[in-house]
């Protein structure tokens, strides 16, 4: 494991040591999964098992427990909006850290954590204007570098109970609400929206309109990684390639290209086909964004529209 990663992880409060922390995490996640899903299906079980494997391999159980404690503490007074890569984790969803189900968002856990991670993921939290100091009181000084809290004047200062009640029953399937949410940002088009993921797409196009003239074929990081995985890489290998592309680390990119060519050839791709796929992903990676983060934005927008309509009613 990378020494930088280990040193950063040492800053996290260790309420349960080593294996004990992992056991506690499993127990809390199991309760959370039952609360989220009722009956835990095979897909959910397999995803949780995969995430637990990587959490154990990176010895980060206490990190997930700490995130859950911090979010719960802030939520006692303020609703914390989470837009960061924790939205890619089913463990985080079951812990109540995020309200995004990564299975529905089509996101992969390795976007958050891999065996080759060099830095502990930062938890980014946004709170309404004027509530930052109050939210920061929940953090210990030694771990402030691992959690960032920012104020956002555009966020409504809602009662956390109202927000949690909404997410307990939300299906995000009301087409009128989806259209109203899009219209509130000037995004409503001729084609009716049917899903919160479609609303997320509109949010991406609005924020990155200047890039869209390039007509990128890839919109999300998840799409880029899926292309590499389908050709033969594991999700960990594909995520390492994505990060190398984003950092423009030529030595690492060349290493990933060699690994990709070997894997693709085993799956029946020619060298030319493999190079074309790899080069296309490298070219377009900077156009892509994390789908799970934009699904979170879309869900919050839908929620705000619902609560505003409820108040008017």
Language model features with spans:
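Alpha-helical scaffold/interaction cores of sigma-54-like transcription cofactors
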Residues: 1-313
């Amino acid at each position: 494991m990378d020494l930088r990663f280990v040193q950063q992880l040492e800053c996290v409060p260790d309420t349960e040591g080593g294996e004990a922390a992992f056991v506690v995490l499993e127990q809390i996640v199991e309760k959370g999964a039952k609360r989220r899903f009722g009956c835990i299906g095979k897909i959910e079980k397999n995803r949780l098992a995969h995430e637990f494997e990587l959490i154990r391999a990176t010895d980060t159980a206490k990190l997930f427990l700490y995130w859950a404690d911090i979010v719960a503490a802030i939520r006692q007074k303020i609703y914390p909006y989470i837009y960061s890569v924790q939205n890619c984790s089913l463990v985080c969803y079951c812990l109540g850290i995020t309200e995004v189900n990564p299975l529905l968002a089509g996101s992969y856990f390795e976007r958050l954590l891999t065996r080759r991670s060099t830095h502990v993921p930062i938890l980014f939290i946004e709170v309404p204007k004027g509530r930052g100091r109050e939210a920061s009181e929940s953090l210990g000084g030694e771990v402030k570098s691992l959690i960032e809290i920012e104020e956002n004047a555009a966020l409504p200062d809602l009662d956390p109970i109202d927000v949690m009640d909404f997410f307990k029953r939300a299906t995000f399937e009301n087409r009128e609400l989806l259209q109203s949410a899009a219209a509130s940002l000037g995004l409503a088009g001729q084609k009716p929206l049917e899903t919160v993921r479609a609303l997320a797409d509109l949010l991406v196009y609005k924020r990155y309109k200047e890039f869209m003239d390039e007509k990128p074929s890839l919109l999300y990081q998840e799409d880029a990684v899926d292309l590499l995985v389908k050709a033969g890489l594991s999700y960990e290998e594909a995520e390492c390639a994505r990060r190398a592309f984003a950092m423009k680390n030529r030595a690492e990119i060349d290493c990933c290209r060699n690994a990709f060519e070997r894997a693709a050839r085993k799956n029946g791709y020619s060298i030319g086909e493999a190079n074309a796929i790899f080069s296309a992903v490298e070219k377009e990676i900077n156009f892509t964004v994390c789908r799970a983060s934009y699904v979170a934005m879309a869900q919050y927008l839908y929620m705000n529209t619902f609560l505003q309509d409820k108040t008017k009613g």
